[in-house]
Curated annotation (Swiss-Prot):
One of its GO terms (biological process) is queuosine biosynthetic process. PANTHER family: 7-CYANO-7-DEAZAGUANINE SYNTHASE. This is 7-cyano-7-deazaguanine synthase. Pfam families: QueC. The keyword Ubl conjugation does not apply. The gene is queC.
Length: 218
């Protein structure tokens, strides 16, 4: 019997790489995306297209009502998206309070209902400085909670937790992945801005891999 897994899939290059890894490992993959009111909801269109291309089961769940409780992030509220690299202090405005705990909790519940025993998500070392819910200690504690929250044991797996976006892209290029199927920019315009932290980190990853980013930029 093929083992089922859930992959939290934003439509970005990190989770796209993780999704493809799970597919190549032979799992029955169930991709799960969330509309949490992000201004870059365009990524969900990319997520849908990628899953159709891969032939992966995919659900997009609308939880945008949570913004009545957890506003204030530049990703969900009427606040300017900061420009510059992730390491800069201004990027903390892109933190959505408790986002990954909420998304992972829902994904674990979905996994239990599917009789899946793993939930994958694409946290990596480049997120550690800015996003507390992408750090190793967070993943460790979430797994502790998962071990006691249900009768069924579900493990949260983050394959690139100690690696950078550069490493993620290296792995993806080695798998022959098409990153034209992904969206990274925090601004939801027709073309990627090339200036926000997400774009800067993506462009750096392609540069360090001596590869051409297929995404169009302003």
């Amino acid at each position: 019997m093929v083992q089922k897994v859930v992959v939290i899939f934003s439509g970005g290059m990190d989770s796209f790489t993780v999704l493809n890894m799970a597919v190549k490992e032979g799992y029955e993959v169930h991709a799960l995306s969330f509309n949490y009111g992000q201004r870059h909801s365009k990524e969900l269109d990319y997520a849908s297209r990628a899953c159709i291309t891969l032939g992966v089961a995919h659900k997009i769940i609308d939880i945008s009502a949570i913004n009545e409780l957890i506003g204030g992030s530049s990703l969900t509220s009427d606040v300017d998206i900061p420009e510059g690299h992730y390491a800069e202090e201004s990027m903390k405005s892109t933190v959505v309070p408790n986002r990954n705990m909420i998304l992972l909790s829902m994904a674990v519940g979905y996994a239990v209902s599917l009789d899946a025993n793993k939930v994958y998500y694409g946290a990596h070392s480049g997120d550690h400085d800015i996003y507390p819910d992408c750090r190793p200690e967070f993943v460790e504690r979430m797994n502790d909670v998962c071990a006691i929250a249900n009768y069924e044991k579900v493990e949260i797996v983050s394959p690139f937790l100690y690696q950078s976006k550069i490493d993620i892209l290296t792995a993806g290029l080695n798998m022959g992945l098409d990153y034209n199927l992904t969206w990274t920019c925090y601004n939801g315009r027709e073309k990627a801005c090339g200036k926000c932290g997400a774009c800067q980190e993506r462009l750096e990853a392609f540069d360090k891999n001596n590869a051409q980013d297929p995404l169009e930029y302003e």
